[in-house]
From Swiss-Prot:
Family in the record: Belongs to the glutamyl-tRNA reductase family.
Signal peptide span: none
Function (record text): Catalyzes the NADPH-dependent reduction of glutamyl-tRNA(Glu) to glutamate 1-semialdehyde (GSA).
EC annotation from Swiss-Prot or TrEMBL: 1.2.1.70
Pfam families recorded: GlutR_dimer (PF00745), GlutR_N (PF05201), Shikimate_DH (PF01488)
Record site: Important for activity: 101
Species per Swiss-Prot/TrEMBL record: Natranaerobius thermophilus (strain ATCC BAA-1301 / DSM 18059 / JW/NM-WN-LF)
Coiled coil: none
Official protein name in the record: Glutamyl-tRNA reductase
Protein residues bound to substrate: 49-52, 111, 116-118, 122
Domain notes: Possesses an unusual extended V-shaped dimeric structure with each monomer consisting of three distinct domains arranged along a curved 'spinal' alpha-helix. The N-terminal catalytic domain specifically recognizes the glutamate moiety of the substrate. The second domain is the NADPH-binding domain, and the third C-terminal domain is responsible for dimerization.
Biased composition (Basic and acidic residues): 426-440, 448-458
Region Disordered: start-end pairs: 426-458
Amino acid sequence: MILAVIGINHETASVETREQLAFSSKQVKELVQKLIEGQPIKEASVLSTCNRTEVHFTVNTGQIEAGKNHIMTYLSDFSDLDPREYVDHLYFITDQEAVSHIFKVTAGLNSLVTGETEILGQVKKAYQLSDEAGGVDSIFHGLYQQALRTGKRVHRETGINDNAASVSYASVELATKIFGSLQNRRALIIGAGKMSELAARHLYSNGVKDVIVINRTIERAKNLADKFGGLYASYDQLSEWLNEIDIVITSTGAPHFVIKEEQIKRAMKSRKYSPMFLIDIAVPRDVEPSVNNQDNAYLYTIDDLEAVVESNMQERQEEARNAELIISEEVAEFMVWYKTRDVVPLISALREKAEDVRKMELEKYHKKLKNLSPKEQEAVDKLTKSIVNKILKEPVLRIKEFAVEDKSELYMATLAQLFDLEDEVIPKDGEEHSSSKEVESVTQSSTERGHHESDFHN
């Protein structure tokens, strides 16, 4: 079984390309359902944010090319893009490198703004949507549980998000660089999601005079505005507010432009061409790019935030190195679990066989032991269990070590023959054998630090 990642991000593709491969929650679920229909994809999850679209998947060994082609077919179907338009922007990684990548993404190390916290919620949502679509089984439950724990641990144990901790923060920082000060400035926020809330928080902390929230759902606009004592309005009032504000920060999930050039043209005339700065952090973009053609209208996209991010990068380098160490440790732990999954049935069968022999031998001596007191019989039972466990301890450890070193198949077959366990399921290339219950048992034993709580439901 191969665990892999295929995708694009802000480092490999421009916003123009990324927005065409950005998917709504509904599309994510539909895409996952299509990906897992039939062969060769076993498990699949889709992470789609403003900075990346990735498909995480498992596929039988030997079918990796078929899996990639399967994914690209559906990416094209859902985006109406010819694969030739984006294939050069794709990255493809497998197994430990893929796990490390997912953990780094979740911790915010691969984000436009290193250490941003929004990605944790986005990964959690991708996990939930993909699970609801039927794309998540034992491997991905283990993967995302540990990825989310790792992300939280990185933020808890390092100061990586002490500076520009989000795209929203960077957008407000850009506005501050433009104006010098936000005192007496009026800002319009379009959208009422998490990024919009963070933007509002940062605007107020930088002394902005007023924040007006516009959202498709007026109730959500009101709820967000009420948190900060701001104003709210409906989309019908957008053109009216464009006549009065200095800064627009927009982050909706709309599949079309929310602000068009013609609107800005009319607004600039009405406001006698006083400067307006628009910061579009949505993917797909909310603002028609030709807005930049209007005098004194200055449009910035999410890709333009890179310069702002770079200014704080030096301060975060040391914390990023500390985060890398944490991630390396967590990846190593996950890989032990991942590689030992297939030996769980054999280990269980070996223990059951030994337990059957122990009970059978005790039964033979039942008459001789019946004169013992209950306490003495309990002591004999514990003694025989202890002997069995001690005999099995080293073989079980060796089986797991061989699995981690990718040497398990021959040794497992030999062990099965030696102990007459051939009827037990021995993993063959590309087969999945560990039950969810068995895998969970191994997961719990490999996470003895007490952090096996469910991040999915928290």
